[in-house]
Regions:
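Single conserved hydrophobic/aromatic residue that forms the stacking wall/gate
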Residues: 1-12
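Phosphate-binding glycine-rich/basic clefts of nucleotide- and phosphate-handling proteins
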Residues: 30, 35-43, 60, 91-179, ...
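A short, contiguous, amphipathic alpha-helix enriched in charged residues
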Residues: 43-54
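Flexible, glycine/proline-enriched loop segments at strand-loop-helix junctions
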Residues: 25-35, 50-51
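Residues forming anionic-ligand binding surfaces in small-molecule and nucleic-acid pockets
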Residues: 13-24
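Gly/Thr-rich phosphate-binding beta-strand-loop-beta motif of the actin/hexokinase/Hsp70
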Residues: 9, 67-98, 113
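Short acidic loop-to-helix transition motifs that present clustered carboxylates
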Residues: 56-64
Length: 191
């Protein structure tokens, strides 16, 4: 929250505490969530004999836990690639000033690998986690990844792909996700 006290001849933009003025201007970013969602979550936690200490936005928590203090102060975007969605937050002067999300995430990358290599989703997730990357180097053309499938066809199940081929499957989806985040930031006036 940024607040400013506007008086007849002065404008205080740091903190209006203890000041006197005619108007109080407030610039804030508000995140909303359905009350039922919070109640359901709190009920689940309570049924596990735990207490809910509080509720916080995942975008806020990700930014606070991954950005160093200087980044939060000078300004940075934190992008959190989740399974089914990607959240992003902007920090400036140690405050989150914007947050949002798009409905693309790591599961979409896994699905692309599954389709591209013709392997089950479980196998694709293991391949992504163990061998995934986004920038191909010269050694990646020679780095072979053994693909295990479950079709019953020995030739099909026991084959290899290069790490470069895997990167070629993953990179377009990640680029799409980052472009979508960039578009949302442009729409919000931050790019």
């Amino acid at each position: 929250i940024n607040a400013g006290l506007v008086g007849s001849e002065m404008c205080i933009r740091d903190s209006p505490r203890g000041q006197i003025g005619n108007n109080l201007d407030v610039d804030l970013h508000m995140l909303t969530v359905r009350a039922k969602t919070i109640r359901d979550l709190a009920h689940c936690v309570k049924r596990c004999d735990l207490e809910l200490a509080g509720v916080a936005s995942a975008a806020y928590v990700s930014g606070r836990s991954t950005l160093v203090e200087d980044e939060q102060e000078l300004g940075a975007v934190c992008i959190d690639l989740g399974g089914g969605s990607t959240s992003y937050s902007i920090f400036l002067k140690k405050h989150m000033i914007f947050a949002g999300s798009i409905m693309l995430g790591g599961n979409h990358v896994t699905r692309d690998i599954s389709l591209g290599l013709q392997v089950p989703m479980v196998v694709a997730e293991k391949i992504k986690t163990k061998n995934g990357g986004l920038i191909a180097t010269g050694i990646d053309d020679r780095d072979l990844i053994e693909i295990g499938g479950e079709t019953g066809d020995w030739e099909h199940d026991r084959r290899t792909v290069t790490r470069s081929e895997l990167i070629g499957i993953m990179r377009p989806r990640i680029e799409e996700i980052l472009e979508d985040v960039r578009t949302q930031l442009e729409i919000a006036g931050f790019y």
